[in-house]
């Protein structure tokens, strides 16, 4: 069984103005999903995640998160927590570690 997951050296997804890499760890644990996301400008479409809480840890850079209409600045070392059902977007040049609880699936997401 694999317990250590290396960051893949190529992107596994791209959408809007973000690109990222998923850690393929579901076989070991399907309770949380992890991805590293990079963006030059942010994610301008508003998102509502119906089933997952999103936890974004800012690895590099700075920007803003708008969560349920409230805008807050963030920078390297900060953690943004978005509860399921909240509407959010983010802007700025950042590298983020995303943890979703439970495991994220595309059909759970609405964009505006």
Residue ranges and their predicted role:
Residues 25-33, 39-57, 67-68:
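A short beta-loop-beta micro-motif enriched in histidine and acidic residues
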Residues 68-85:
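Short acidic-glycine-tyrosine-enriched beta hairpin
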Residues 84-109:
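Ligand-binding loop in jelly-roll beta-barrel domains
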Residues 1-36, 46, 111-112:
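A short, N-terminal "cap"/entry segment at the start of jelly-roll beta-barrel domains
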């Amino acid at each position: 069984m694999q317990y250590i997951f290396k960051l893949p050296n190529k992107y596994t997804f791209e959408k809007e103005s973000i690109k990222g890499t998923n850690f393929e760890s579901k076989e070991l644990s399907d309770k949380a999903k992890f991805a590293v996301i990079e963006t030059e400008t942010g994610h301008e479409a508003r998102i509502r995640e119906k089933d997952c809480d999103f936890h974004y840890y800012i690895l590099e850079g700075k920007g803003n998160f708008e969560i349920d209409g409230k805008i807050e600045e963030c920078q390297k070392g900060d953690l943004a927590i978005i509860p399921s059902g909240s509407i959010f977007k983010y802007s700025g040049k950042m590298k983020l570690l995303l943890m979703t609880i439970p495991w994220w699936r595309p059909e759970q997401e609405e964009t505006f």
